[in-house]
């Protein structure tokens, strides 16, 4: 029963879409209506508002961090263990990808996954974030950086901690993140992928395409 409660609460926390909420609060267009069409920080940045993008990034990372951190640090007193941590991690991530509050149409989960990893272990989280930053800095492709981080996160975890149940959750999240970027992979191969900082087109009413997002 405890793990079911963990799953439901974590999923609902993950279902809060900061991209939509922040954009609405700041009088910006709905991020689902331009650019990649995905509610994430990278797409919000295409609105031209760095402040909104930063707030979205922080919010999405925080919601991933919160339930996992709580279970890691306070779970034992409620009979929770590493399995509960793994459940919280996957549930909050799924909440971001398929949010109940926004018709199950969410972002791609990079910032939320980063928050989850930081909660599991700060060293693991920082190593994965550095991977994203290095690739993003040299290529300016958010999607390519996300894919690199998704590949290396389970590797970093294996080197740091060896086999454990939480590693399975990390593999699941990484696999889902790569799956959510399948459109980006195709666009990268065609040389059509949007770069970080590209603004939305003047014809914002045009149908969104599958661009990068965090």
UniProtKB/Swiss-Prot annotation:
Reactions that this protein is recorded to catalyse: an acyl phosphate + sn-glycerol 3-phosphate = a 1-acyl-sn-glycero-3-phosphate + phosphate
GO CC annotations on file: plasma membrane
TM helices/strands, residue ranges: 4-24, 52-72, 82-102, 118-138, 159-179
Taxonomic superkingdom: Bacteria
Pathway: Lipid metabolism; phospholipid metabolism
Membrane topology (UniProt): Multi-pass membrane protein
GO molecular function: acyl-phosphate glycerol-3-phosphate acyltransferase activity
DNA damage keyword on record: no
Pfam assignment, any one: G3P_acyltransf
InterPro entries found in the cross-reference section: G3P_acylTferase_PlsY (IPR003811)
Transmembrane keyword on record: yes
Subcellular location as annotated: Cell inner membrane
The EC number(s) this enzyme carries: 2.3.1.275
PANTHER family in the record: GLYCEROL-3-PHOSPHATE ACYLTRANSFERASE-RELATED (PTHR30309:SF0), INNER MEMBRANE PROTEIN YGIH (PTHR30309)
UniProt function note: Catalyzes the transfer of an acyl group from acyl-phosphate (acyl-PO(4)) to glycerol-3-phosphate (G3P) to form lysophosphatidic acid (LPA). This enzyme utilizes acyl-phosphate as fatty acyl donor, but not acyl-CoA or acyl-ACP.
Assembly: Probably interacts with PlsX.
Entry-linked NCBIfam families: glycerol-3-phosphate 1-O-acyltransferase PlsY
Family assignment from sequence similarity: Belongs to the PlsY family.
Protein name: Glycerol-3-phosphate acyltransferase
């Amino acid at each position: 029963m405890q793990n079911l409660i963990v799953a439901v609460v974590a999923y609902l926390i993950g279902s809060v879409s900061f991209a939509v909420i922040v954009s609405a609060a700041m009088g910006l267009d709905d991020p689902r209506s331009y650019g990649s069409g995905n509610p994430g920080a990278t797409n919000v940045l295409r609105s031209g508002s760095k402040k909104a993008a930063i707030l979205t990034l922080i919010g999405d990372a925080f919601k991933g961090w919160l339930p996992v951190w709580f279970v890691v640090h306070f779970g034992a007193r409620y009979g929770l263990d590493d399995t509960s941590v793994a459940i919280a991690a996957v549930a909050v991530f799924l909440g971001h990808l398929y949010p109940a509050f926004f018709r199950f149409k969410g972002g791609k989960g990079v910032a939320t996954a980063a928050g989850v990893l930081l909660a599991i272990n700060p060293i693991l989280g920082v190593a994965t974030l550095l991977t994203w930053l290095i690739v993003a800095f040299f290529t300016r492709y958010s999607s390519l950086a996300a894919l690199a981080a998704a590949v290396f996160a389970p590797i970093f975890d294996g080197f740091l901690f060896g086999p454990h149940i939480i590693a399975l959750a990390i593999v699941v999240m990484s696999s889902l993140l790569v799956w959510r970027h399948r459109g980006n992979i195709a666009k990268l191969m065609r040389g059509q992928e949007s770069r970080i900082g590209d603004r939305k087109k003047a014809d914002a009413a045009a149908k969104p395409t599958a661009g990068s997002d965090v």
